[in-house]
Amino acid sequence: MNNLIKSKLELLPTSPGCYIHKDKNGSIIYVGKAKNLRNRVRSYFRGSHDTKTEALVSEIVDFEFIVTESNIEALLLEINLIKENKPKYNIMLKDDKSYPFIKITNERYPRLIITRQVKKDGGLYFGPYPDVGAANEIKRLLDRIFPFRKCTNPPSKVCFYYHIGQCMAHTICKKDEAYFKSMAQEVSDFLKGQDNKIIDELKGKMAAAAQTMEFERAAEYRDLIQAIGTLRTKQRVMAKDLQNRDVFGYYVDKGWMCVQVFFVRQGKLIERDVNLFPYFNDPDEDFLTYVGQFYQEKSHLVPNEVLIPQDIDEEAVKALVDTKILKPQRGEKKQLVNLAIKNARVSLEQKFNLLEKSVEKTQGAIENLGRLLQIPTPVRIESFDNSNIMGTSPVSAMVVFVNGRPSKKDYRKYKIKTVVGPDDYASMREVIRRRYGRVQREALTPPDLIVIDGGQGQVNIAKQVIQEELGLDIPIAGLQKNDKHQTHELLFGDPLEVVDLSRNSQEFFLLQRIQDEVHRFAITFHRQLRSKNSFSSQLDGIDGLGPKRKQNLMRHFKSLTKIKEASVDEIVEVGVPRAVAEAVQTKLNPQETEILLQVAEERVDYQTEGNHNKP
């Protein structure tokens, strides 16, 4: 953190607004919103973060902020700033993603076409459809039933489609506008699932053709009826009211979010939109940003209603989308939201599983790594990382990979016991000594390779303990990160040297996963420990706030930061007496309390002076 950022952090207000992070080139790399600008922006430069947030913070050299009147105004401003500046760390939906629609043109002799552009031109649009293949399938069926004009430029003679009964041949057609409007209404009814009338008509025509011995024509009608039946089975009925609605659900895990949107048209689920992306703020806030961007895309028409999960701010969504917003509590609509959430969870799990479950790749990776380091295939790899902030609550963590996959039952956490202050080398010495001293004492199976998340100093410390103190023969490698906190170099050998390792190789990806996993495990443990210590210490000594009320506060607000941001009334709602709630706010926000007292004193002084001046 440079001096400019330090100075600006002192000037941040507690108001809602947007903040803009910039890199060394002055480019905007991230835009965020906050209910409390001071708390949110400061959080980036304090404490531990996961890998993706560390990568963002490492690039920040300056920031700006814009104060707004409300949280909703901040949300709207954030969406506009993202759209205008396209910061690389923000959620960005693909601009080129569009869905096909079936359109009946607003012409004297209308046409039935497929388009990806929705215009206010008087045409009738149906969709969107999952892909152009699905739209074409339905259009081909409609062409066989409804004889709309096919030609863009009218030919002087009747066309091929006229002869096969798929065009009215408007050059000789005597039908008026009312006829085509009626046909357009039939198409609309058909696409809404009201197709019984058409099926009955086709059955009648099939029977008539069979009676007159026109078996080929009867077979055509039979095929049409079967095609309609097939289409029915492909479009699952999700709601009985035949409404157009978008159903949102989301799920978060390991710093990633998946949002699923179900497009329900005329009561039928016709498509879903799936997006996975890393998030940096509270999940519900980034979800709102996603919704705002979603409806800025021209291809996403606003439906009759939008269904959202329970934990989302309904008023904020109403400010983003001009339609009916519902947070269903029960029944069919609640089931739709739950289904969207379930699918989001499954999609996110699949993403992580694909990274971990490729047996051939992981097996090949450990074999190649063994050949590269000239050691036996490292079937079992143990990796270590330390975590502390200015020496407070120092911890270390060990993760284990067996056959290239994480073996979570073997993970271990270590509280550093013998080190005072921020000494990474001494912490590494202690944890290596504790781990492999136990391996030696209890005759446990040693790993085939130890991987240290660190540079030459940490690796040499580990070597001293393993080889000189304990007399063990275990290969030790180090993984160094670059200035963007990304896996950069593999260190190995005696003396240590940088190993020539292709960044596109499976062994590199394996080491990257190991480094990310041990880092995640270490900072998660450190965050839990620090939060526990901080929570206990900051709320200790408040009269009337016992262990149970502390537990209720944490269960409701999830974090100490959110308790700090909460109003006295919000704390009272959790079951805390008002006097105790005021004491909590006073202790957690001493600066704000001081300012309020100062303002109150100045007001009293002013009133007193005014009274003295009265005659």
Swiss-Prot record:
Keywords: Cytoplasm, DNA damage, DNA excision, DNA repair, Excision nuclease, SOS response. It is found in: Cytoplasm. Residues 196-231 form the UVR domain. GO terms for biological process: nucleotide-excision repair; SOS response. InterPro entries: GIY-YIG_endonuc (IPR000305), GIY-YIG_endonuc_sf (IPR035901), GIY-YIG_UvrC_Cho (IPR047296), RuvA_2-like (IPR010994), UVR_dom (IPR001943), UVR_dom_sf (IPR036876), UvrABC_protein_C (IPR050066), UvrC (IPR004791). Residues 14-91 form the GIY-YIG domain. GO terms for cellular component: cytoplasm; excinuclease repair complex. Gene3D superfamilies: 5' to 3' exonuclease, C-terminal subdomain, GIY-YIG endonuclease, UVR domain, UvrC, RNAse H endonuclease domain. It holds the Pfam family UvrC_RNaseH_dom. Transmembrane segments: none annotated. One of its GO terms (molecular function) is excinuclease ABC activity. Disulfide bonds: none annotated. Interacts with UvrB in an incision complex. The UvrABC repair system catalyzes the recognition and processing of DNA lesions. UvrC both incises the 5' and 3' sides of the lesion. The N-terminal half is responsible for the 3' incision and the C-terminal half is responsible for the 5' incision. HAMAP family: UvrC. Belongs to the UvrC family. NCBIfam families: uvrC (TIGR00194). This is UvrABC system protein C.
